[in-house]
Amino acid sequence: MFAVIIGLSIGIGLPMQTAINSRLRNAFSSPLLSSMTSFTIGTIFLALVALLITHSLEIGVDLIKNQPWWIWVGGLLGVIYLTGNILLFPHLGGVQTVIMPIVGQIIMSMLIDNFGWFYSPTHALNIIRILGALLVLLGVFLAISAQKLFSARKEIISDNSLLQNSNRNSQWFWRIGGIVTGMFSASQTAINGHLGTVLNSAVKAAFVSFLIGSIALWIIVAVVEHGYHFSPAFNRKFPWWIWIGGLIGALFVLGNAYLVPLIGTGFTVVIVLLGQITGSMLVDQFGWFAAKRNPIVPLQVLGIILMVIGIVLIKLF
């Protein structure tokens, strides 16, 4: 039960991070620069926590030599997932940009559980777990798109008008890309979980993941943005909380690294996903962190119920 509470909590926090980082993005006028700043703040936070708990950030050379190469790429996969979402939105619209990576997350998490990839705990795939995964996907779709179905399809029409300007084959390319980025996200969860076991510290694993991701983003920003332009964020007055998105993201990665060895990748992914969808609905309902208010509709509640049923099936079978 404690693991479930952690998973739900970090999942609920993720949409709050998204809302916060959207304001940070406005401050910098650059999604990449805001992501780099968020990652860097999260890295510093995790370094301090790791020093407080383990009294060291050192990783032995022998450990690096004796472990598989993929154990260090979790942070890079996180950056690919983050950047992928930025690239997907103009081509797929709001709904599909959320749905496609989630499809990839669930598919990959079930495969990781079934085959024990990345040294994750093994949970054999069966028809009941597949049914549970399908219910989770249906619940996600209802929870995300219900407001659009209830609002005379205005936003869906807007999305469709955007998509009509794109070639259909191109749309499928981006849909597959969305699924692949979701699979990378699930892989990151499993990899960081094993890294936490190897380092005997989930905190240190989260720090390594964030550090590598931060380095990658600093390089990407230097190439794409031709430098680091921080002054716009300080020339205008913004609320203090625009800087805490990285802390929430750090806790998210830390929570995942802690949970995977305990409950497996598949269950971790779907529990966190339930928290994520619930958090999104709360942000919409109450307009937290200056987000636009979108009151919850009954179909979204039905979506949450279906997700819970699906999660129970995945857990019990």
Locate predicted features.
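Structural signature of hydrophobic alpha-helical transmembrane segments
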Residues: 1-14, 62-77, 128-138, 174-179, ...
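Membrane-interface interhelical linkers
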Residues: 1-9, 23-26, 32-36, 40-70, ...
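Hydrophobic alpha-helical transmembrane segments of multi-pass membrane transport proteins
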Residues: 12-16, 20, 69-91, 184, ...
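Hydrophobic/small/kink-forming positions within alpha-helical transmembrane segments
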Residues: 15, 19, 47, 75, ...
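Structural motif at transmembrane-helix junctions in multi-pass transporters
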Residues: 26, 30, 84-100, 197-201, ...
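C-terminal transmembrane-helix exit sites in multi-pass transporters
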Residues: 101, 107-127, 278-298
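Hydrophobic transmembrane alpha-helices of multi-pass small-molecule transport proteins
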Residues: 125-146, 296-315
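Extracytoplasmic gate region of multi-pass secondary transporters
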Residues: 181, 185-193, 197-198
